[in-house]
Each structure stands twice: as C-alpha cells, then as structure tokens.
Amino acid sequence: MDTKDALALDGLTKRYGDGPPVIDDLSRSFAPGSLTLLVGPNGAGKTTLLRLLAVQAYPTSGTVHYGDLDVHDTPYRYLQEVGLVHAGPELPEHLTAEELLEWILRSREHWTDEEGPSRISALLNRVRLDERRSNLIGTYSSGMVQKAQVAAAFVAEPAVVLMDEPLRSLDTATSEATVDLLRAFVEDGGLAVVASHLTEPLRPLAEDVLRLDDAPTDVTSSPPAQHSSP
C-alpha cells in the first residue's frame, strides 16, 4: 500500500429520478489512517454513499476526489487502490475463492509466483475459508460468500477499503478476524469507510462516526464513544 491520500467530498448530492436527494450537498473528507463508521436506519443513504465512493453510482452533482483524482472521471486509477465488500453477494460464481483472489492480484499487477499462493492461503485461512478454497463460489453459503468478500477486499493490499455490512452472516471467529484485519489496515495507514448495523465491534476502531438519518439532509458527524481499558 504505497498511496496514502484522503478522500474528499465536495457538495456531493445523489437523487433518483424526481425524488428527494438521498445524499444532499455532503462535504467532508476521510483521512488515511482512519476508519469512519457509517450508521443510521435502513434507507438513510449508507449504501448509496458507499456506492458513490466505489464508483458504482455517479453523483447528481458534486465531486469525490482521491488525492488529485476525480474518482468518477478517472475510475480505473482510483479503483486499483480500493478493496470492496458489497451490500450483496456480487462475486463470480464460476470461480473458486482461490481463483478469485489470484485474479485480483494479477489484475492489479500484485501477483508473483513466489508470494501470491502463500498470501492467498494465509488470508483464506485467516477468514476460515481455506478448506473450501477450491470449491466454486456458487456452492457457498451466504456466510462463506461474505468471507470470500472480506478476503478479496484485503488481498491486493489496498489503500482504501469500502465495506457495506462486512460482519453480516459471519461466525464469531471470522467476525473477530475481520475486525483484526481492519485494525491492522488502519494502523498501517489505510483509509476505511464502513457501514454496519453491528457497531459494537467496530466503534473502538472508528476515528469518526457519521450518522445518516431518515431525512436526506440530516447528516451528523461525531467522535466515537470512548472505551475504557479493562
């Protein structure tokens, strides 16, 4: 992970059709070395915001910059630095988990014959998917698909991770492993934006908590709750 730039939003607005804006004139930045936790009820705009940051949707108005890059004008360069966990199981069912991670490494020019296989094995073992590494993703349960998504997000050592409900469907051990991966990622200078209804495990990592409420214009930002040491 060489690039350590901020994500900067300027007047970001997204509406669908003639409806009210889901995201309305949002300006803020996300710094490297930090995790921002997105919270709020269903329909408040968390997934829409993550889709905008991941260039899976385009703004009605406003911009998102990663360093000097307008991410919607130059998506390829930006997305080379991004790891994603999607809201839905959007993984190719005709690949195995092992093949998926190898494809990501090769497509981002991070593959080497010496280190690639061991990196994949270690990461799949970390998320407790190593025994199913050679099975097609189309045969996976929802929990196994989620494990594959988490592994895919981290395998190419991204500078940014964008995660929509990363702990959903995970067993306790894999949930803890995912939190540990996020902690190490942020400590190494990574930038993480995470939406989750399961906030308790993530709040200790959060530099900031961004609350999106039912009203499209109701966006507040606050520091996370302080946690005392045991």
Model-derived features: positions:
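Q-loop/switch helix immediately C-terminal to the Walker
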Residues: 95-109
